[in-house]
């Protein structure tokens, strides 16, 4: 036969568990030194919050998926935490329900693929992070899906080839609009520009991020239209042949 003392212990444990796991709103919590408390309480909050932001707290820290809503009830974002730190996927949505942004965190730092989307679902840009720093190829796309910009990062700094492409409304053509190079985050060396038919219309040089020497402008037949002379980024002379 279960004793009265044993029943009282069970009841006490159940009551404490229920009271410590109650659902409240974010406005009912206060944050102190990174830990969340209920107002007028000195005990770190454990439980769930409801309303425009839903999620779970354990001992004053965010755990698991937190969902934020627009005022009309549609999902705005889904963010994952572990012990108050961003861990896992971070998803943001347009009001129409389509994905706006997708990224991943590890121990509060961006890690892996990061993608932005147009409101109709097409990819806008794509890049990768390693410990919160951009690393590797970064691509941007026109609304029709054609490649717009292709550049490269090394340890969060632009490095190597930076290419911009023309946009073609109907034809699946990949035509370079401009090409330049980066070294340690600064434009370095030759740059060149092309028209929509692939004709070279501009070329010149950069030195440590500044224009240096002669910049040539051409018409579509290759004839020089003008020469502009730079020194340490400053315009020295401009000559027109038109």
Put a short name on every predicted segment.
Residues 1-7:
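Bacterial N-terminal signal peptides that target proteins for export
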Residues 16-242:
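Glycine/tyrosine- and acidic-biased, solvent-exposed loop/turn segments at the edges of beta-strands
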Residues 8-16:
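Bacterial N-terminal signal peptides
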């Amino acid at each position: 036969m279960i004793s009265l003392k044993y029943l009282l212990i069970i009841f006490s444990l159940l009551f404490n568990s229920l009271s410590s796991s109650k659902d409240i709103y974010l406005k009912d919590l206060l944050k102190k030194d990174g830990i969340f408390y209920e107002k007028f309480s000195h005990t770190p909050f454990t439980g769930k919050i409801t309303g425009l932001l839903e999620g779970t707290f354990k001992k004053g820290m965010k755990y698991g998926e937190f969902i934020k809503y627009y005022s009309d009830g549609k999902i705005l974002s889904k963010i994952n935490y572990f012990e108050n730190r961003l861990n896992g996927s971070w998803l943001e949505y347009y009001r129409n329900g389509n994905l706006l942004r997708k990224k991943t965190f590890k121990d509060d730092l961006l890690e892996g693929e990061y993608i932005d989307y147009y409101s109709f679902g097409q990819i806008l840009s794509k890049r990768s992070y390693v410990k919160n720093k951009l690393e590797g190829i970064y691509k941007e796309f026109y609304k029709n899906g054609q490649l717009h910009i292709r550049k490269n990062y090394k340890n969060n700094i632009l490095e190597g080839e930076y290419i911009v492409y023309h946009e073609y409304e109907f034809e699946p053509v990949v035509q370079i609009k401009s090409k330049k190079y980066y070294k340690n985050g600064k434009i370095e060396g030759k740059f060149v520009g092309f028209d929509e038919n692939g004709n070279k219309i501009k070329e010149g040089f950069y030195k440590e991020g500044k224009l240096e020497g002669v910049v040539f402008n051409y018409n579509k037949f290759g004839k020089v239209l003008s020469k502009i002379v730079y020194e340490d980024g400053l315009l020295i002379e401009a000559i027109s042949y038109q």
